[in-house]
Amino acid sequence: MSGLGIMVLTLLLLVFMATSHQDAGEKQATQRDAINVRRRRSITRRVDEECNEYCDDRNKECCGRTNGHPRCANVCFG
């Protein structure tokens, strides 16, 4: 194989290695973001369930929380 052929193969190998490292970083960041989203959803869901149970006992709708306490109303605005 000529010197030019070896140089071309080496260049292709270097380009492949560089792009594979970039993809790994993006994949890792995507997985980390997905874990954070799952944690937020589980926390939000638990809070919503508590609020819904509290307001259902009073025959009202849960409109979220104010200062850590469930906010109940007949109709939620906003």
From Swiss-Prot:
It is found in: Secreted. Belongs to the conotoxin O3 superfamily. Disulfide bonds join 51-63, 55-72, 62-76. GO terms for cellular component: extracellular region. Residues 25-44 form a propeptide. The modification Phenylalanine amide is found at residue 77. The presence of a 'disulfide through disulfide knot' structurally defines this protein as a knottin. It holds the Pfam family Conotoxin. Expressed by the venom duct. Residues 1-24 form the signal peptide. Its main location: secreted. One of its GO terms (molecular function) is toxin activity. Keywords: Amidation, Cleavage on pair of basic residues, Disulfide bond, Knottin, Neurotoxin, Secreted, Signal, Toxin. This is Conotoxin TsMSGL-11.
